[in-house]
Structure formats: C-alpha cells, structure tokens
Design a protein with these regions (language model features):
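N-terminal capping/small domains of soluble enzymes
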Residues: 1-5, 9-14, 196
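Generic alpha-helical secondary structure signal
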Residues: 14, 54, 84, 191-194, ...
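Short amphipathic alpha-helix initiation/capping segments at coil-to-helix junctions
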Residues: 134-138, 161, 185-193
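Contiguous, function-dense segments enriched for cysteine-driven chemistry
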Residues: 153, 184, 220
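Shared catalytic-loop signature of beta/alpha-barrel
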Residues: 169, 174-209
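Alpha/beta enzyme core
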Residues: 9-157, 163-179
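Extended, intrinsically disordered, low-complexity segments
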Residues: 135, 198-221
Length: 221
C-alpha cells in the first residue's frame, strides 16, 4: 500500500539515463526528475534545467530511455510561466508533473562571518525557501498547469507549504492527484502525516465523499 519515488538529478544525458537504470534496478516505483533544486554549485543543474526548455526535453527523454517506470518532471517555481517547461517535459515522455520546488532565495546573512545561510565548511550557496509561506505561489503554478490545454489529463503531484488537511484539500481541488510534504515533517515530525490523513478522512465523511478522486479538480469547475 506504499510506493517509493526515487528523485534523481544528473549533469549530462548519459548520467540521467544511467541514474534511471540504477533506481529502476533498485526497485523504486516512480522516478522524479529534479529539474528544480536551487541549491546548486554547478551551472546547468537543478533549477537551471527547469528554466531551459531544451534541457528539460532532452533530460526527460534521457530518463525515459533508461526506464519503463512512470516518470515525473519536478518543476521550478523560479520562472514566470511553469507551463512552458511542463509541456516540454510531457512532450518528451513525462508521465506526470511535480510542483513546486523551493523558491530560490538568500535566507539570511551571518553577521559575524558575512556569509549567506546556510554555511557548510566555510562555503555558501543560494538557498531554497520553503514552508507555509510558499503555498500561495505553489497553488498559482499548479492552477496554471491544471487549466493549460496542452497539459489536460496529465497527473500533478502537488507540494509547497502543505501543513494541514485544509492545505491538502486545496491542492487536490486545484487538480493535484496526490500531495507531498517535506518541510512540515521536518518541523513537526511524522505525526503531521497522521494529522493530515485524519483531517481528510473527517472532511470526506462530513461531506459524503467516498474517494479522494472526487476532490481532484473540484476547484476548477
């Protein structure tokens, strides 16, 4: 009753294909292509990929060459129109989309060292901002993809600021087939998952909803 999603990121087409083969052989159920991580020290990786349609298309195709598993393309919010790379990924064979990753940012400066947070062994990099504050940004990008004619019927895995069952309902209502939670788990522990499931179950019982599928896209009608 559980699945394993392997998140991968390569630097070349060959690396993407090889990584896809490795995680497939390891037994994962779904592959998520990380085209969107802002914390990179190498050009042409992470969120740099997600803003480059040609790279999104090439790397998605490379992953598909290495696996028969479903492939999700994880989109960067550090772009004006997320539908552009999303369409490119789907045309290259992506089976679904995941959004959003963190917001490219500088989260603070250490006034003693004058280096940006987080500092690791004396080195810093542009960071990614996550948590409750990014939810409205996530909902906007997800809505854009959900109503895009070229992405009609493409499953979306939603994330970005989800902390409660109410947040989960909102993501589902805008078309997400499922949701992902990371920052809230880091803040509050794994009990947050139990809380979300419990709240969703109660909400469904109160509204006579038999399946979560009934909620998917309900806010788009």
């Amino acid at each position: 009753d559980r699945i394993i999603v392997a998140s991968i990121m390569g630097e070349t087409e060959d690396e993407w294909t090889q990584l896809a083969r490795l995680v497939t052989d390891a037994g994962c159920d779904i592959i998520e292509c990380n085209f969107s991580c802002p914390q990179m020290t190498v050009e042409g990786m992470g969120s740099d990929v997600g803003t480059n349609v040609q790279l999104v298309q090439a790397y998605t195709a490379a992953v598909k060459r290495g696996t028969t598993l479903p492939v999700l393309a994880k989109m960067t919010p550090n772009i004006t129109d997320m539908t552009v790379p999303a369409v490119a990924a789907v045309r290259a064979g992506a089976d679904g989309l995941a959004a959003i990753n963190t917001i490219k940012s500088i989260t603070g400066i250490d006034e003693e060292t004058m280096q940006a947070h987080p500092g690791v062994m004396g080195k810093t990099a542009v960071s990614g901002y996550s948590g409750k504050a990014v939810k409205p940004i996530a909902l906007r990008h997800i809505y854009d993809m959900a109503v895009c004619p070229e992405l009609s019927g493409v499953p979306i895995s939603g994330m970005g600021g989800i902390e409660t069952w109410r947040d989960a309902v909102q993501f589902l209502a805008l078309g997400c087939s499922n949701i992902q939670i990371t920052t809230a788990v880091m803040q509050y522990g794994y009990r947050i998952i139990t809380d979300v499931i419990g709240g969703l179950t109660d909400y469904m019982n109160r509204h006579g909803i038999a399946s979560l599928r009934e909620l998917v896209g309900a806010g788009l009608e």
